[in-house]
């Protein structure tokens, strides 16, 4: 996991400041001003440091930014000829590039999704106030598109928890010890996620001011499935579970726009698609390679004690737990999103020198689709 210093240097400048932007070439400071409500025009106004003139640039994996207004969380959204303020959906027309022209100036460019060569910049319609922001293909020698940061306020990022070693397998202390229901939990990774991509009862406008970045924490532990004392040479059938419940899958998708694929990789929706690389890197997960979602499956498995003495066996499966937190550490989803991965199982035993039980027939008896 990246520590805070690394995160601070890893996130581009776009993600670390609250900005007031003005057009550099104007005779008077023309600051970009978002409407009070979504679905309105982005305008230029006299710089007044109103809440509508403060913006956060949320960076994506490919270097583009999502420009969100601090007042209500609405974002720059491209239309046919101009840019408006709208609710964030993950549309390609909500991703802009900040192109540096000089040390002090840059322009905001957007690419036409239907044409790789059609790159347009934002330009005021006129030098009269107020003025709408329009697109122009006149970029090369056009000083009217240049923007500078009239003011930048440093954005405090959440402190992420430190990574820990992978969870240790529980050890049984005696023939009557069934072991813990769960092993000690280990933090595997954590990642920042913009507030516009998550679901919370706090209004989006309030989130932009108090917790513009949330974080997702990935924890792992060993979950007990069963425990039994096997007489010498005995065979027993045990019930085990794998996957994730439908309730948790839906809740996770609603909460962070991420779900878990059938191969235990992460599947990203439109809102989070632009940060999937950084998200999986930081949380020590992978992007799914399947279109199928993970479901909960129940198995029966036969185990045989091949020893000539009684052995206590306790079966464990690796659990991956995801939780969403505000910048102050408060957990948003009171019930964690948990997936049990039966590709990673272990059996604790006592006496410790006993061999593992012999695995026999395995049968799927139920899943979420039946």
From Swiss-Prot:
UniProt PTM comment: Processed by proteases in the mosquito gut, probably at both the N- and C-termini.
Molecular functions (GO terms): toxin activity
Disulfide bonds: 31-47
Domain of life: Bacteria
InterPro entries linked to this entry: Ricin_B-like_lectins, Toxin_P42
Positions of the pro-segment in this chain: 1-6
GO biological process: sporulation resulting in formation of a cellular spore
Keywords: Disulfide bond, Sporulation, Toxin, Virulence
Sequence segments annotated as region (Beta-trefoil domain): 1-155
Region annotated Pore-forming domain, chain positions: 156-370
Places the protein is found: Spore, Perispore
Comment field on protein domains: Has an N-terminal beta-trefoil domain and a C-terminal pore-forming domain. The trefoil domain has barrel and cap subdomains; the cap has 3 carbohydrate-binding modules while the barrel is involved in host cell receptor binding. At neutral pH the carbohydrate-binding modules are accessible on the toxin surface but the barrel subdomain is not.
Subunit relationships: Forms a heterodimer with BinB.
Protein family per UniProt: Belongs to the toxin_10 family.
Function per UniProt: Component of a binary toxin active against Culex and some Aedes mosquito larvae; mortality towards both C.quinquefasciatus and A.atropalpus is maximal by 48 hours. A.aegypti is not very susceptible to this toxin. Binary toxin internalization into host gut cells requires both proteins.
Name the UniProt record assigns to this protein: Binary larvicide subunit BinA
Species of the source: Lysinibacillus sphaericus
């Amino acid at each position: 996991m990246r520590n805070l210093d690394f995160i601070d240097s890893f996130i581009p400048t776009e993600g670390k400041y609250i900005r007031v932007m003005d057009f550099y070439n104007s005779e008077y400071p023309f600051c970009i001003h978002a409407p009070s409500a979504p679905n309105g025009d982005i305008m230029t106004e006299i710089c007044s440091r109103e809440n509508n003139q403060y913006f956060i640039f949320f960076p994506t994996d490919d270097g583009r930014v999502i420009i969100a207004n601090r007042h209500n969380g609405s974002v720059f959204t491209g239309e046919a000829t101009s840019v408006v303020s709208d609710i964030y959906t993950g549309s390609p027309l909500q991703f802009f590039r900040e192109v540096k022209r000089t040390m002090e100036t840059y322009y905001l460019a957007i690419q036409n999704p239907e044409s790789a060569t059609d790159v347009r910049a934002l330009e005021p319609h006129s030098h009269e106030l107020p003025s709408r922001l329009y697109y122009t293909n006149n970029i090369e020698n056009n000083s009217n598109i240049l923007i500078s940061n009239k003011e930048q306020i440093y954005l405090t990022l959440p402190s992420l928890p430190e990574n820990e070693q992978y969870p240790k397998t529980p050890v049984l202390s005696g023939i009557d010890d069934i072991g813990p229901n769960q092993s000690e939990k280990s933090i595997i990774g954590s990642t920042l996620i913009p507030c516009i991509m998550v679901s919370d009862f706090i209004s989006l406008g309030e989130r932009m001011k108090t917790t513009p970045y949330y974080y997702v924490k990935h924890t792992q532990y060993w979950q007990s499935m069963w425990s039994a004392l096997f007489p010498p040479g005995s065979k027993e059938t045990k019930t085990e579970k794998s996957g994730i419940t439908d309730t948790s899958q839906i809740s996770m998708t609603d909460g962070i726009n991420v779900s878990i694929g059938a191969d235990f990789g992460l599947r990203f929706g439109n809102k989070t698609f632009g940060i999937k690389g950084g998200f999986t890197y930081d949380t020590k997960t992978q992007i799914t390679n399947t279109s199928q979602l993970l479901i909960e499956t129940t198995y029966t498995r036969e185990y045989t004690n091949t020893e000539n003495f009684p052995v206590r066996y306790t079966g464990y499966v690796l659990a991956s737990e995801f939780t969403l937190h505000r910048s102050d550490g408060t957990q948003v989803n009171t019930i964690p999103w948990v997936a049990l991965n039966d590709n990673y199982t272990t059996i604790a035993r006592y006496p410790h020198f006993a061999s593992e039980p012999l695995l026999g027939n395995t049968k799927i008896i139920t899943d979420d689709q039946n």
